[in-house]
């Protein structure tokens, strides 16, 4: 560590204020704490470096000496006045961490109750199931307490013993000597894996784990109005806790299939309905499909293509139970691509009656028409 820049370790520039040092330490210590990075040796070493840097930079006298001489001078022996024990007796950095976070992580080192891990499961729903709600039965695989050993991990009739390496704490303390003095750090005990206990005769069913993998069927009530991206928490349905800790939670991720006719936007439903040119001009009554069934709706005369009408309360029920969204019907007026002579004559008459001027070629006999007549 002596070859490293303590400021750089905390992501700071030299001369950083006390508040900046504290904020940087808090952020990095939470990120690299062993409890959040179990089995990650790189994160464990990073955590040690972070605490070592903070022990120096948080102490005014040590910080002043460090700022004056720099880490390179320590390596060259220019700081020999401190010797190897200038800062001995500093204690473990877990005390520093606990002073910041109230001992929230220390309970694990003392083998206190530990909450079980959370689980996730994705449920696929049809459009209608999401709108009206549905009961689903899912099957998940999770750890369950071993029935053979009642979760102890030890063979029936035997018991676990306190780890003789860590004394039951689950952590071992390691002293590191640097030019700034002796630093005491802790790491997970490699003999008991942090449990503080060792099992001489493990259970033959769970092989000492205390848990076994089992498939479990769970019925879940999915409320009306859910949509893709919604997450439903099922409390206590996750992995079992340790040392009497609570179970984790199961989070149900919702995924809704699209519909061939309906488009959902929030709690509103959108649909397109096609009508003919004549019906748009004269008005008509159409049958509109909704999630509740078909309804009749009158289209007024002179409706323009793209006009949108609202069917109040025909949308998706709100998850909180306060009413429903609306359904919006967008009318598309279909213009015929080809018409016969009778239809053409009627349209020309309509335009003339409306006072519209015909185009230069509209309604006139074409050359092709004249040629056809000459052969009749």
Swiss-Prot record:
Where does the chain bind Zn(2+) 2?
163, 166, 189, 192
Cofactors demanded by this protein: Zn(2+)
Principal place of residence: cytoplasm
Q: Name one GO cellular component term.
A: cytoplasm
What does the record say about how the cofactor binds? Binds 2 Zn(2+) ions per monomer.
Q: Where in the cell is it found?
A: Cytoplasm
GO-annotated molecular function: ATP binding; heat shock protein binding; unfolded protein binding; zinc ion binding
Question: Per UniProt, which keywords does this protein have?
Answer: Chaperone, Cytoplasm, DNA replication, Metal-binding, Repeat, Stress response, Zinc, Zinc-finger
Zinc finger intervals, CR-type: 133-215
Give the InterPro entries listed for this entry. Answer: DnaJ, DnaJ_C, DnaJ_domain, DnaJ_domain_CS, HSP40/DnaJ_pept-bd, HSP_DnaJ_Cys-rich_dom, HSP_DnaJ_Cys-rich_dom_sf, J_dom_sf
Tell me which family the UniProt entry assigns to this protein: Belongs to the DnaJ family.
Q: Assembly and partners?
A: Homodimer.
What is this protein for, i.e. what is its function?
A: Participates actively in the response to hyperosmotic and heat shock by preventing the aggregation of stress-denatured proteins and by disaggregating proteins, also in an autonomous, DnaK-independent fashion. Unfolded proteins bind initially to DnaJ; upon interaction with the DnaJ-bound protein, DnaK hydrolyzes its bound ATP, resulting in the formation of a stable complex. GrpE releases ADP from DnaK; ATP binding to DnaK triggers the release of the substrate protein, thus completing the reaction cycle.
* Entry comment, domain topic: The J domain is necessary and sufficient to stimulate DnaK ATPase activity. Zinc center 1 plays an important role in the autonomous, DnaK-independent chaperone activity of DnaJ. Zinc center 2 is essential for interaction with DnaK and for DnaJ activity.
User: What's the protein here called?
Assistant: Chaperone protein DnaJ
Organism encoding this protein: Clostridium novyi (strain NT)
Gene behind the chain: dnaJ
